């Protein structure tokens, strides 16, 4: 309905141009918004006020001209002018009911799919050789929700898990493994849990021993030069680390696979060429022995240009170099239309600089869009970055295990007689859903407080509330299995039926916001509002005890569409649903 309203306004504007009321070359972005007050209709636009200067008329006069030139539409019941010149559209109830019937019979809930694009999504991307910690949670689950949403909207999505599988940390690990095997024999085993210990011990040795640090640096060079022994160990470290990552992904219900991994090492062969190409274009400068690029748009507090360091004085490459190589690959090989980067907001300047430089150097197609989807930090209840009681980094697996334990206690307290296996399965779904939803429901650019107590509550905008709302709606059908809905039609008569129908019709608008702006919290807010609208409808409008058979069937269809929408929405967030809680 929103796009239909915009098209009506576009036709009216064209008519005004033809009549000479508005200059023919006038360009206007027609904005249509949902009204907050139903007495003001369903949609409102400020188009008349945008045309005031161009038409040299007052806004209410222009608003009337716009209305006079609107094409006839069976979808619109009436149009009114409000305030200084807003135009309010009231949607016809029968048109809304027909839209809901179409949604009920559609694989995409009636959502109009945009033109398909190829979209690269860079997310999760942990540094290997360490266990994943809570700092990896936001990129992983926000990115995955947007990926699911993009695919639902018909786009071709290429997942890119740009893992940190190269660099100094591997030199430290290789040097430490040499020492370990010298002491324990060539067959010293590497186990998953050892990686953290290896890394910590290697870091201590690296910081304390100059000999060890020099050895580690030499091993990095050997690794980069293709040394067979170093490469074998490097692959072993990576394989163990990736196995751990994918255990986490599976537990989280994230769609990343091994085939989506394309780490920093993938671009090693391109780094020298990146430097050479920047140099050939005269973009490189030298600063303290390093090769850098200065861009006038980026300055420090003193007004001096900020450098993008491309190659260190010792010949080593940096994130900017590998990011430039990755951008070139994503543009020219993958032929992407958009590339979305789900990386901490603290990297905003870095991405602004490399995005600009890649376009300046013509490494990427001019029409391709590069978008940093930054996010804030997850904090403890003290408002500081989330830590263990001892002040250490919280391992992601430990967080998920605690969520399982707390969810099991919660579910058992509400279902003391339930079978233990069923309790465990419900707790698994509720625990993971609660952790994910608590994050996804927050605006990604904001920091947020992590609280098990809040996220496991059955009240408010939480996963348990929405999961229960779904089971409640689904439960209606279990009690109505004998009702034949083949000839049923949705009819909107009661105010609460219309409110629920209006909310159901907004799903497509919300999905466009999720995929265009990378904002899953908009979908969370919508699902919470939808559950509330259904609750109000269910209290005011008896379903199985409706006055007539036709009314009962109509309300069952509304409940069915609500259940489909809740389930689809939760799935797009990466949350499983339950038929019973």
From Swiss-Prot:
It comes from the Bacteria. One of its GO terms (cellular component) is cytoplasm. Gene3D superfamilies: Arginyl tRNA synthetase N-terminal domain, HUPs, Isoleucyl-tRNA Synthetase, Domain 1. It is an enzyme of class 6 (ligase). One of its GO terms (molecular function) is arginine-tRNA ligase activity. It is found in: Cytoplasm. GO terms for biological process: arginyl-tRNA aminoacylation. InterPro entries: aa-tRNA-synth_I_CS, Arg-tRNA-ligase, Arg-tRNA-synth_N, Arg-tRNA-synth_N_sf, ArgRS_core, DALR_anticod-bd, Rossmann-like_a/b/a_fold, tRNAsynth_Ia_anticodon-bd. It catalyses: tRNA(Arg) + L-arginine + ATP = L-arginyl-tRNA(Arg) + AMP + diphosphate. Monomer. Belongs to the class-I aminoacyl-tRNA synthetase family. HAMAP family: Arg_tRNA_synth (MF_00123). This is Arginine--tRNA ligase. It comes from Shewanella piezotolerans (strain WP3 / JCM 13877). The gene is argS.
């Amino acid at each position: 309905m929103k796009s239909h309203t915009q098209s009506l306004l576009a036709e009216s504007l064209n008519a005004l141009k033809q009549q000479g009321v508005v200059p023919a070359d006038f360009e206007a972005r027609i904005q249509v918004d949902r009204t907050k007050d139903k007495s003001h209709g369903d949609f409102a636009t400020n188009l008349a006020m945008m045309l005031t200067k161009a038409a040299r008329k007052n806004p209410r006069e222009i608003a009337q001209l716009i209305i006079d030139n609107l094409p006839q539409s069976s979808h619109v019941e009436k149009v009114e002018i409000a305030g200084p010149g807003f135009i309010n559209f009231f949607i016809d109830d029968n048109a809304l009911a027909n839209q809901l019937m179409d949604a009920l019979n559609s694989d995409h809930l009636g959502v109009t799919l945009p033109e398909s694009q190829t979209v690269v999504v860079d997310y999760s991307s942990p540094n290997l050789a360490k266990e994943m910690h809570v700092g990896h949670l936001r990129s992983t689950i926000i990115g995955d929700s947007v990926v699911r949403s993009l695919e639902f909207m018909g786009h071709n999505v290429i997942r890119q898990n740009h893992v940190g599988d190269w660099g100094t940390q591997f030199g430290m690990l290789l040097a430490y493994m040499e020492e370990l095997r010298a002491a324990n024999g060539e067959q010293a085993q590497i186990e998953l849990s050892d990686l953290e210990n290896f890394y910590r011990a290697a870091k201590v040795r690296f910081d304390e021993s100059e000999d060890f640090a020099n050895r580690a640096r030499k091993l990095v060079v050997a690794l980069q030069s293709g040394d067979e022994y170093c490469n074998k160990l490097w692959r072993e470290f990576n394989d163990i680390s990736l196995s751990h990552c994918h255990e986490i992904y599976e537990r989280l219900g994230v769609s990343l696979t091994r085939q989506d991994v394309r780490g920093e090492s993938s671009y090693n062969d391109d780094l020298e060429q990146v430097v050479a190409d920047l140099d050939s274009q005269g973009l490189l400068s030298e600063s303290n022995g390093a090769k850098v690029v200065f861009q006038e748009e980026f300055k420090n507090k003193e007004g001096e240009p900020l450098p993008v360091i491309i190659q260190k004085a010792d010949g080593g490459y940096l994130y900017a170099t590998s990011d430039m190589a990755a951008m070139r690959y994503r543009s020219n090989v993958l032929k992407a239309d958009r590339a979305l980067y789900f990386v901490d907001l603290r990297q905003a300047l870095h991405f602004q600089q490399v995005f600009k430089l890649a376009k300046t150097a013509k490494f990427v197609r001019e029409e391709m869009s590069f978008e940093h989807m930054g996010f804030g930090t997850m904090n403890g209840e003290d408002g500081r970055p989330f830590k263990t009681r001892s002040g250490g980094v919280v391992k992601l697996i430990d967080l998920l295990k605690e969520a399982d334990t707390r969810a099991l206690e919660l579910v058992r307290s509400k279902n003391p007689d339930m079978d233990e296996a069923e309790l465990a399965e419900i707790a698994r779904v509720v625990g993971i859903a609660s952790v994910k939803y608590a994050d996804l429901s927050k605006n990604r650019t904001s920091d947020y407080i992590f609280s098990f107590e809040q996220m496991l509550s059955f009240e408010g905008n939480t996963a348990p509330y929405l999961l229960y709302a779904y089971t409640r709606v689904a439960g209606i059908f279990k009690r109505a299995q004998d009702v034949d809905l083949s000839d049923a039609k949705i009819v909107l008569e009661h105010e609460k039926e219309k409110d629920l129908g209006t909310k159901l019709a907004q799903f497509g608008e919300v999905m466009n916001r999720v995929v265009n702006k990378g904002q899953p919290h908009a979908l969370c807010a919508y699902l919470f509002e939808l559950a509330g609208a259904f609750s109000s409808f269910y209290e005011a409008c008896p379903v199985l005890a409706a006055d007539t058979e036709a009314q009962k069937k109509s309300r069952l269809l509304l409940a069915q569409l609500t259940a489909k929408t809740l389930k689809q929405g939760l799935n797009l967030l990466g949350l499983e649903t339950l038929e019973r809680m």
